[in-house]
Swiss-Prot record:
<dbReference type="GO" id="GO:0065002">
    <property type="term" value="P:intracellular protein transmembrane transport"/>
</dbReference>
<dbReference type="InterPro" id="IPR008158">
    <property type="entry name" value="Translocase_Sec61-g"/>
</dbReference>
<dbReference type="GO" id="GO:0006605">
    <property type="term" value="P:protein targeting"/>
</dbReference>
<keyword id="KW-0811">Translocation</keyword>
<comment type="similarity">
    <text>Belongs to the SecE/SEC61-gamma family.</text>
</comment>
<keyword id="KW-0472">Membrane</keyword>
<keyword id="KW-0812">Transmembrane</keyword>
<dbReference type="GO" id="GO:0009306">
    <property type="term" value="P:protein secretion"/>
</dbReference>
<keyword id="KW-0813">Transport</keyword>
<dbReference type="Pfam" id="PF00584">
    <property type="entry name" value="SecE"/>
</dbReference>
<protein>
    <recommendedName>
        <fullName>Protein translocase subunit SecE</fullName>
    </recommendedName>
</protein>
<comment type="function">
    <text>Essential subunit of the Sec protein translocation channel SecYEG. Clamps together the 2 halves of SecY. May contact the channel plug during translocation.</text>
</comment>
<dbReference type="InterPro" id="IPR001901">
    <property type="entry name" value="Translocase_SecE/Sec61-g"/>
</dbReference>
<comment type="subunit">
    <text>Component of the Sec protein translocase complex. Heterotrimer consisting of SecY (alpha), SecG (beta) and SecE (gamma) subunits. The heterotrimers can form oligomers, although 1 heterotrimer is thought to be able to translocate proteins. Interacts with the ribosome. May interact with SecDF, and other proteins may be involved.</text>
</comment>
<dbReference type="GO" id="GO:0005886">
    <property type="term" value="C:plasma membrane"/>
</dbReference>
<dbReference type="GO" id="GO:0008320">
    <property type="term" value="F:protein transmembrane transporter activity"/>
</dbReference>
<keyword id="KW-1133">Transmembrane helix</keyword>
Amino acid sequence: MVESTFEPNITTKSVGQAIRAHLRVLKLTKKPSREEFLTIAKVAGAGILAVGAIGFIIYVLLTMLPQWVSQ
């Protein structure tokens, strides 16, 4: 059986620890350069287009294939 990891006893100490952990991560981050941002945007856009193209191909096959088989 899976044990619940829910922690019902939220204290100010645990909230403070969580905030400190998040702040530590935020201090390590940096704003991406324009070139880095554009590269990430291009890769993400290409991925979205690829998934959309695959979905469209599946849609066309599922709508046209029954017509071809029944003829």
